[in-house]
A protein has these predicted regions:
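Conserved C-terminal guanine-recognition region of P-loop GTPase G domains, centered on the G4
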Residues: 108-114, 133-207, 261, 278-283
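Catalytic P-loop NTPase motifs of RecA-like helicase/translocase cores
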Residues: 100, 123-125, 157-158, 186-187, ...
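Conserved G1/Walker A P-loop phosphate-binding module
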Residues: 2-5, 9-14, 18-19, 24-147, ...
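Conserved, well-folded catalytic cores of nucleic-acid-processing
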Residues: 88, 107-111, 141-148, 201-204, ...
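P-loop NTP-binding site
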Residues: 248-356
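Solvent-exposed alpha-helical segments within well-ordered globular domains of core cellular machineries
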Residues: 83, 102, 106, 136-143, ...
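Canonical P-loop GTPase G-domain recognition
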Residues: 175, 184-246
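Conserved glycine(s) of the Walker
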Residues: 77, 217, 308
Length: 356
């Protein structure tokens, strides 16, 4: 190793093991106390800092907090339920399957508890590298949360897709809550049939029937999952709504407008990156690039005389002005990146990869 190179963690681990193996016993390895030279005052300050890092603000005894993953097939209503729980739109929605590509966290505060809802991509049989990453992202959350809310559409017969999701959900260590969504679109007999079929897939710790668009049982759903949260600190500040960056919100809301305007023509080939975001005194200046895989798709998004891209920009700007609370100047470009959905580097560039 040259003098200018820093040793990696693996090299350091190997060196520590080599020293230990060279000694007659581990007793001969010199003990190291990182706090040995610290005064009592410095130790107290370190402890105070550690307590501040563990949570935000004082909480009363019995305060509950934790993470709730919303999982299910594509178009099961996960993002719509997340928005309903939060009270306003933070996750994009569209009739197109696999609209959600990024894990989105939304913080919901209530007296006595804090819930962090995690919206996940729909779990499905992947057809490309992007689909595989979306599945990994969703499945990663199952054992990393306190509660898994398994969403099943009340209007669609339960099939192999739901069964495949259930196989993963039932093996999770988390509590499981069955959530039957879109109840406003189903008759009572259909709801009862869906509940029966859902219980043939697996066992649940609780269940609830909801309609996010009608705000039916949304608060009851929040209370249901909060019951399973452990006692703990407030993980996020009370004034924090989502962990998504401004750049992520820009990219997602632009992509949503593309999906809604183009529908079935090019949905899965679209990726968006926010290239620049600058806040001036009176306006937020934003530049984003829409990527597709073929020249023909680029033409569809631009539209005749630029009409389609104009409407996409107007729609996105309205949402961004609502989110950021300021006037937005939005500039959009459209570029072709052939085969990006099977390119791991490009998937990471768009931010659609599962966490390492």
């Amino acid at each position: 190793m040259s003098d200018n190179m820093q040793p990696t963690d693996e090299v350091l681990d190997d060196e520590v093991l080599d020293e230990a193996e060279g000694a007659d016993s581990f007793d001969e390895v010199e003990e190291f106390d990182p706090f040995e030279d610290m005064s009592d005052e410095e130790l107290d300050a370190l402890c105070d800092e550690d307590e501040n890092l563990a949570g935000f603000g004082d909480v009363e005894p019995g305060f509950r907090s934790g993470f709730v993953a919303l999982v299910g097939r594509p178009n099961a209503g996960k993002s719509t339920l997340l928005n309903a729980c939060y009270g306003k739109k933070v996750a994009i929605t569209s009739p197109v399957a696999q609209t959600t590509r990024r894990r989105m966290r939304a913080v919901v505060n209530r007296p006595g508890y804090q819930l962090v809802f995690v919206d996940t991509p729909g779990i499905h049989k992947p057809k490309d590298g992007l689909g595989s990453e979306l599945n990994k992202s969703a499945l990663f959350e199952l054992n990393d949360v306190d509660v898994v809310a398994f969403l099943i559409d009340a209007t669609k017969p339960i099939g192999r897709g739901d069964a495949w999701v259930a196989e993963h959900v039932k093996n999770a260590r988390s509590k499981k809550v069955l959530v039957l969504t879109k109840a406003d679109e189903a008759d009572p007999a259909q709801v009862m049939e869906q509940l029966k079929a859902a219980h043939e897939l697996m066992e649940y710790d609780d269940e609830i029937v909801t309609s996010s668009v009608k705000n039916f049982n949304v608060d009851a759903f929040i209370e249901t999952v909060a019951h399973f949260l452990p006692e703990g600190p407030r993980w996020f500040p009370e004034d924090m709504g989502t962990d998504a960056s401004d750049e992520t919100l820009v990219a997602e809301f632009v992509r949503e407008k593309v999906l809604r305007r183009t529908r079935d023509e090019i949905p899965h080939s679209v990726g968006v990156i926010c290239d620049a975001l600058e806040q001036t005194k009176k306006v937020l200046r934003v530049h984003a690039t829409i990527y597709v895989e073929r020249e023909g798709q680029k033409g569809i998004i631009i539209g005749k005389g630029g009409e389609m891209i104009k409407h996409i920009g107007i729609d996105a700007r309205r949402d961004l002005e609502r989110i950021f609370g300021t006037q937005v100047f939005l500039e959009l470009d459209v570029k072709v990146k052939a085969g990006w959905r099977d390119d791991e580097a490009q998937i990471r560039r768009f931010g659609y990869n599962a966490e390492d």
